Every structure is written in C-alpha cells, then in structure tokens.
C-alpha cells in the first residue's frame, strides 16, 4: 500500500497501519538444537546462541526450553515501534552515535548529525547542514544547504497538531541553541535566529531575529556573518 507522505494525515495513517515491531536480541547458553528458528536470525557455536527477531517468537523459544538454558540475556531498545530507523550505511554524511533518525528521511552530502539529535519521518537535511546535539527536526521539516541548527533547537513537525505546510529552513541559515521554529514557518536564506528565540511568523532573507516571539532586530551585516560563519572542516 502506498502513502502520500507529504500529507500529515497520510503519515498518521501510515503509522497506524504499519506492523508494530518489538525486536530483541537474545544471548543464550544452552541446548537449542531441536528448536524451530523460522523467522528468527540465528548465530551459534555449540551451546552458545545469538538470536535476532520479534520478542514474541524468541520468548516462546526461551519459555519452552527453559530447562535446557543455563544463561540468557535479552537486549531491547523499542516496543511496538511503527517506523524503523534509517539505514545509514550508504549515506555520505557524518552521523554521530546516539542520533535517532527515522526511515524515509533524506540526508544530504557531507551533512553532520550530532549526538542526541532526533530527525523524524519525511524530514530533509540539506548538503553541508549540521543538526547539533539534542536538536529536533520534526516530521517533514526541511533544512536547506549549509544550515546550522543549534544544540537543543526544535524545528516543529507537521503531525501533531496536523499541518499541511512543513517548516522550511532555507540555505545558509543559522538557528541558535534552544530556539523553536513553530509549525509551517519559513526562514529565508541567510538569516540568523538568535538562541532561545521562539519563531511564530515567517522570517525574510538576510535578517537577524530574536526574542519570544521573535522579531527582526537588524539585517545581516559583515559582523554578523563573521560571528556566525560555519567551519568547513567539520563537514569533511
């Protein structure tokens, strides 16, 4: 079944209808030689087993063979999850440990995703853009090229409350730490959002905004550009 992931209601339907998954990893010492491992990925040497699969299937095996099991350890990182995480193996970007990126996200060349960042379904991260520590890009949030999304900043998504228009951050924008960009807002090219600001209306190109709610305080000048310039070495 196909879904139009540009529509927040379609995204919600996709999540609703997705098969929920509770994958686990089990390390087992014991005799499981007579077990049926259909639908379970198994690695073993003698009586040592590593099993990957859905919790209900692996737990049935453990329960049925508990008298033959000497030791068992289970690792679990989600429950009834609707959307898998993004396969990052073929992405040409720097993605640090602890970043959480859901499937159906686009990551541009030489982007940087730092520890603790969260990027939701349908988001787009442009070439050379940095999503700093603990920043959040909500569903369908769009960040252009060479954007800096500061630590703890939030680009709101379209899901709840539902919004037909995603947040759009155009090229060469700098968003300071802990700033919040509300649903459907557009930040024009080259603009700067000061740390801690709450942006409730669209921002034109090449201006500096600050405050809660954010207001234009000046145009971007040479001094501003010097203070907010990005470091190319961080993107290589």
From Swiss-Prot:
GO terms for biological process: diaminopimelate biosynthetic process; lysine biosynthetic process via diaminopimelate. Keywords: Acyltransferase, Amino-acid biosynthesis, Diaminopimelate biosynthesis, Lysine biosynthesis, Repeat, Transferase. CDD domains: LbH_THP_succinylT (cd03350). Gene3D superfamilies: Hexapeptide repeat proteins, Malonyl-CoA ACP transacylase, ACP-binding. The gene is dapH. This is 2,3,4,5-tetrahydropyridine-2,6-dicarboxylate N-acetyltransferase. It comes from the Bacteria. HAMAP family: DapH. The keyword Coiled coil does not apply.
């Amino acid at each position: 079944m196909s879904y139009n992931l540009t529509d927040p209601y379609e995204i919600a339907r996709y999540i609703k209808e997705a098969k929920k998954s509770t994958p686990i990893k089990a390390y087992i010492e014991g005799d499981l030689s007579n077990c049926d491992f259909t639908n379970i990925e198994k690695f073993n040497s003698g009586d040592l087993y590593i099993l990957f699969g859905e919790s209900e299937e692996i737990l049935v095996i453990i329960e049925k063979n508990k008298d033959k099991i000497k030791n068992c350890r289970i690792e679990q990182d989600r429950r009834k999850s609707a959307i898998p995480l993004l396969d990052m193996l073929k992405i040409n970007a720097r993605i640090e440990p602890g970043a959480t990126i859901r499937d159906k996200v686009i990551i541009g060349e030489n982007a940087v995703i730092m520890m603790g960042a969260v990027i939701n379904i349908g988001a787009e991260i442009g070439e050379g853009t940095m999503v700093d520590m603990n920043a959040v890009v909500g569903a369908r949030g769009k960040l252009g090229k060479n954007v800096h999304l500061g630590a703890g900043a939030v680009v709101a998504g379209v899901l709840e409350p539902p919004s037909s228009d995603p947040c759009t951050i155009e090229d060469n924008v700098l968003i300071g730490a802990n700033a919040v960009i509300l649903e459907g807002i557009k930040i024009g090219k080259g603009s700067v959002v000061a740390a801690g600001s709450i942006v409730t209306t669209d921002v034109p190109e090449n201006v500096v905004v600050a405050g809660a709610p954010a207001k234009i305080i000046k145009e971007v000048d040479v001094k501003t550009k010097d203070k907010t310039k990005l470091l190319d070495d961080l993107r290589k």
